[in-house]
């Protein structure tokens, strides 16, 4: 803002006097003249507050409005409704601070939030131990690998290609530093290839990584796949979408040793892909190998309930070689948003939203499968996301508006991560996409398919004429 300065001339003189220096030049006399700028910074003239808002509005107008057309993007980040209570609580000064709450003297309110978050995540995953959160889903995958290798003393990691590509990439990066061997198992009809998975697990396998629902939206048989790992002494690690756990069996009941995931669907907006938070839950025997921080409930000398940082095996607190992580901020504010959202939903609401997603996804899937030029990539069961193959129009043309109809569909192109599905895309549903929005998407796909068929017919006719 024009003319604003944090220190007046009198302030500067007082500060110089306090350190026994009589001028700014004297303060910087040890800096060689040749490296000093010697002139004011070449900054544009300042703007008033109203002018700044006008400038920001001008820049924002160049963007596409994501709310102008129904969006069906998913692939790990979902446009869920964030209730007003989330912003109302997270914006309170007791929580919205510039300092990360990992010091031992953190407030009782901050510690209770961590404890409530851990309790909620343990409940929905069916595992007894949760930490206070991690950066995001993929880094939680790396932490799971580290824990599994430490517990088993093995260095082999096996990951299904149904796992999110970002998590697999992160595992591959960390495997280099861990000295681990990472192998991937392919998919068959949208599900992890069970025979290939069983064959890939060896005596040196520390952990098997699965995802449910997987990246294509398919619901995996975690109990069956996990048996292959458990039979050979490997840990079963499952990535989960928290919003599906109201209708799916929790991973802890399916034999998982560790469950982790991306917490963005809970109380966090898309925000250009972040920030978000990750969650990490495990069986109790792995408590002391858990990454990050764990808050506990206790009693003081007067018998009053209190909260403490029970465990924080970070490299800032203990010897580096014994640390389980070096996490700092831990995205505590984002995790707070997540537990507020869960509390707002309640147990009945959590189940209700899962059932709603399943109904709407089933409706969308059946409608799209009936459109000429599009077919389902697989027939495995799904909850809130599914894969579609376009046989009429290139996927990028659908997304860019270059399909002769001008439609620019907000769907995720599978070819980015799966070359074998170059003609495929993901359709994701949230509670913000109702039947009207699904019909809008289907109408756009029908127009695109019709335009593609017409263009192909015209090209064929032109080719026939030239041959004739």
Show which residues each predicted segment covers.
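Conserved C-terminal alpha-helix-loop-beta "cap" of PLP-dependent enzymes
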Residues: 348-441
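Hydrophobic alpha-helical scaffolding
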Residues: 2-5, 17, 42-46, 104-107, ...
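N-terminal entrance/gating region of PLP-dependent enzymes' catalytic architecture
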Residues: 33-116
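Conserved PLP-enzyme active-site core in the AAT-like
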Residues: 15, 139-304, 373, 396-401, ...
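PLP-dependent enzyme catalytic core of the Aspartate aminotransferase-like
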Residues: 2, 11, 17, 119, ...
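Compact, charge-rich alpha-helical regulatory domains located at protein termini
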Residues: 1-38
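Short loop-beta-helix segment that forms the pyridoxal 5′-phosphate
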Residues: 102-106, 122-142
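Active-site C-terminal subdomain of aminotransferase-like
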Residues: 266-372, 376-379
